[in-house]
Regions:
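Extended, well-ordered protein cores
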Residues: 1-10, 14-63, 72-285
Length: 285
């Protein structure tokens, strides 16, 4: 089967600047071995995404993680969950709330199974230890831009169920982020903690105007239903600009850059650099 996307977003350079990212293959993330490793190592398990911005792709990835952690629960009660309209992409909190539609004895039995799975699996990093809100309760509760720097500053630890910091395994499914934080962690291991007092700071100016880059990807992000090919086609000439073979369950995402947002980005950066009297570095990969 083929899915075609017709585009007419041309840059001033005379060609479309489009970015392809394939985040999963066959809808499977290697989460199982990470949960097992976290359990064996006695560290907290955590997943770091950005569901607030990547509104299509990241809740899907979050759902895969939730299904893997509670694999036996989902396998045993899949039909019941489907009848209740439960979607793993919405998180554990939503699942627990939807169980209230069931007779109390049935709901209590499933809740007990969930508790058992959490006891037998690795301990989860907490969003709110006092209220029992885990990393897997709500997709948007842990935002990678904030959660990973905080974890690194805290020597690779997050909060456990007792409200105490504990060594943590951070799973970052999106390769765009993973390499950056891995490099940061490796540097801290070699050179010690980052210290703004001695190293200074770097203000960041994001490329965001007119839904540039990933901010405009929502209507061009798809969870692939069947194996086949995704093609990006020029709507005027019919030329195939790019194509990718995909499997069922893959997440296919396309970003875009236009001329005006880049110009706006440069203007903002230059203005910021002049006001703060700091050098400007432009990074557009």
């Amino acid at each position: 089967k083929k899915k075609e996307i017709r585009v007419n977003q041309w840059s001033s350079l005379g060609f479309p600047l489009l970015v392809f990212e394939s985040e999963t293959r066959g809808g499977i993330l290697p989460t199982g071995r990470h949960t097992a490793d976290a359990k064996k190592s006695g560290v907290l398990f955590s997943v770091h995404l950005k569901a607030t911005m990547m509104k299509v792709s990241d809740p899907i990835i979050f759902g895969h993680v939730l299904r893997t952690y509670f694999q036996e629960v989902f396998q045993r009660h899949d039909a019941t969950f489907e009848s209740l309209g439960i979607d793993a992409n919405d998180g554990l909190e939503n699942l627990l709330g939807d169980l209230e539609q069931l007779p109390e004895d049935q709901a209590a039995s499933i809740r007990k199974e969930i508790e058992t799975a959490m006891e037998q699996g690795p301990s989860l990093a907490m969003v709110n230890s006092d209220k029992g809100i885990t990393n897997l309760h709500v997709p948007s509760d842990i935002i990678i831009d904030a959660s990973m720097p905080a974890m690194i500053r805290n020597s690779g630890r997050m909060w456990n169920a007792q409200g105490k910091p504990q060594d943590t395994k951070a799973v970052i499914p999106d390769s765009s982020y993973a390499g950056v934080y891995q490099a940061t962690i490796d540097d801290c291991k070699e050179n010690g903690a980052l210290d703004p007092k001695t190293m200074g700071t770097v203000p960041n100016v994001g490329l965001m105007a007119q839904k540039a880059e990933e901010y405009g990807s929502h209507d061009k992000t798809f969870e692939i239903a069947d194996p086949g090919t995704v093609r990006v086609v020029d709507q005027h000439s019919g030329e195939v600009l790019m194509e990718h073979a995909v499997s069922a369950g893959d997440i296919w995402r396309m970003c875009q850059v236009k001329d005006k947002p880049v110009r706006n980005w440069v203007e903002l950066a230059v203005e910021r650099a002049r006001l703060s009297n700091t050098p400007a570095v432009f990074w557009l990969d």
